[in-house]
Design a protein with these regions (language model features):
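Non-catalytic accessory segments adjacent to catalytic cores
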Residues: 92-137
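Aromatic (often tryptophan-rich) hydrophobic motifs at membrane interfaces
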Residues: 77, 94-103, 209-324
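Glycine-/proline-rich flexible loop or hinge segments
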Residues: 74-88
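A conserved beta-strand-loop-helix scaffold within acyl/acetyltransferase catalytic domains
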Residues: 5-55, 62-72, 119-132, 150-255
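Active-site/acyl-donor-binding loops of N-acyltransferases
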Residues: 2-16, 69, 120-149, 278-358
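A structural signal for short, well-ordered beta-strand segments and their strand-loop junctions
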Residues: 111-118, 173-174, 224, 279-282
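Short, high-confidence coil segments that cap the C-terminus of an alpha-helix
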Residues: 46-48, 109-112, 274-277
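Short, polar/flexible loop-turn hinges at active-site or ligand-entry regions and domain interfaces
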Residues: 84-90, 145-154
């Protein structure tokens, strides 16, 4: 039996701010706000609006959608959401999934193959995803105790490295907001390039970070660690409604020699606490779908024992047959190189070759 759909309503910026103000205790991810949608627009992307979902007059959830027009797979993506204002039960989530299917199948302005969002209680038609989205685990640092207790809760290794960084002359500065884009482009992006090359990942280009700093400046901090006047490590944090996130960071080889990233993050915690934030999420640690995050997980575990599991991102197909056909095609494309290698190995061995010893 298909669950009864919720009533849904698109929210203007004023509507969203009114809803948020009426629910001060709910953690709303910055990615689920109109301010993040403005940032996406500045990048040339297509925010499709924020909707609220109601059970009668009771607000259940909200979701901000980003339209994607990738070849053969048009979709709507909810980044780090939806936001839940009531208990996230299996029944409530099933109703939201059914509502989203009905909502966008009937929307003449968009024809997505699927909607992608975080789902905690997975049941049909939820499936996939074709590729993974948001990280699934994070470490959270409680900023409500006094600074001495926060520091004492770190692992001994972290406390020692912070002290060593101070003795080695590492200096942490908060960059003036009007200089963020310039400083990032000329001094900090090269550190990101070095980090990406060293750790084997692809970073965004400098324009992405500069746009982030320009468009979301009211909700960001940029802090930099210097050694002998030279920047060696930097971080960007976000803040919204008292919850901060350690969002982007990079460090040079010189930073590692001086333990600068440890002192930098500690100084950031103190600044965030002073600004009224009650917690800081160190987003993105090792999980089943993100084993490559082992190294950063080791670093982040130094600052808190609290690990929070975030619901995994899944797909909600609106056109199941087309979705399954695409899923099969993508799987075959991923498997093709391995299949080709096995065929080549077999040809080299020849028809009389044996697979193992007698």
């Amino acid at each position: 039996m298909t669950p009864a759909p919720y009533r849904f309503q698109q929210l203007s910026r004023e509507d969203f701010e009114s809803v948020a103000a009426r629910h001060p205790g709910v953690v709303i991810p910055l990615e689920q706000t109109p301010y993040w949608a403005d940032f996406e627009t500045s990048l040339g992307r297509e925010p499709y609006g924020i909707w609220a979902y109601y059970d009668g007059d009771k607000l259940v959830a909200s979701a901000s959608y980003l339209r994607s027009r990738r070849r053969l797979r048009p979709s709507l993506v909810v980044v780090n959401g939806p936001t839940w204002f009531t208990e996230r039960t299996p029944e409530a989530e099933a109703r939201l999934v059914a509502t989203v299917q009905e909502q966008f199948r009937a929307d003449p302005a968009v024809d997505p193959l699927y909607v992608r969002m975080q789902v905690e209680h997975v049941s049909p038609p939820v499936t996939g995803p074709l590729e993974h989205g948001w990280y699934e685990r994070e470490i959270v640092v409680d900023l409500t105790p006094d600074t001495e207790k926060i520091f004492a809760a770190f692992r001994p290794n972290a406390r020692n490295l912070i002290r060593k960084a101070e003795k080695l002359g590492v200096e942490v500065r908060t960059v003036e907001r009007e200089r963020w884009a310039e400083v990032f482009r000329t001094e900090l992006f090269p550190i990101m390039q070095e980090t990406a090359a060293r750790d084997g990942f692809s970073s965004f280009d400098s324009v992405f970070y500069e746009t982030l700093l320009t468009e979301l400046g009211d909700h960001l901090r940029l802090m930099v660690a210097y050694v002998e006047g030279k920047p060696v490590s930097w971080l960007i944090t976000t803040e919204y409604r008292g919850y901060a996130v350690y969002y982007f960071a990079a460090s040079s080889r010189d930073a590692r020699k001086t333990n600068a990233p440890y002192l930098l993050l500690w100084e950031a915690f103190k600044v965030l606490k002073e600004a009224g934030n009650t917690a800081c999420g160190l987003t993105g640690i090792e999980s089943e779908n993100y084993p490559s995050l082992a190294n950063v997980t080791t670093f982040k575990r130094n600052f808190s024992k609290t690990v929070v599991t975030v619901p995994t991102t899944y797909d909600i197909p609106l056109h199941p047959l087309r979705y399954r056909a695409l899923e099969t095609a993508l799987r075959l494309r991923r498997e093709a190189p391995g299949m080709l290698r096995r065929v080549r190995t077999g040809l080299k061995r020849g028809p009389g070759a044996k697979a193992g010893r007698d």
